[in-house]
Amino acid sequence: MNTLIELYDERAIENVLAADMFRPKRIIFLCPTEVAQSQQRQEQISDFFRHRGWEPELIFVEASQYKVDRILRQLLSISEKYPDCALDITGGSDAELFAAGVFASKANVSVFT
């Protein structure tokens, strides 16, 4: 696995735990608009990983937290671009988690909790 998809969560530990354990080359965060557009929040996550001794590529993708069909389309699009991806479902909204379940069954990707 070179790419880990994270469902962004306001609880910071949910955004970094699996990534810190598996250390993929790339982490894609599906996140709300305010996070996707916040350099400060993105830098906080980047600083955490740097402090832990590595610098993965971080990609922040603006995503609806409540529209399952849109979330599913984004996940499928990411898996087409990064077929080596896995999905961490420790964070996110109920709609994101539902879309993640459908995505995992359609795309046959590994899922971590």
Where do the PLM segments sit?
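Long, low-complexity, Lys/Arg-enriched
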Residues: 1-85, 98-113
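PLD/PLD-like phosphodiesterase catalytic module centered on the HKD motif
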Residues: 86-88, 92-93
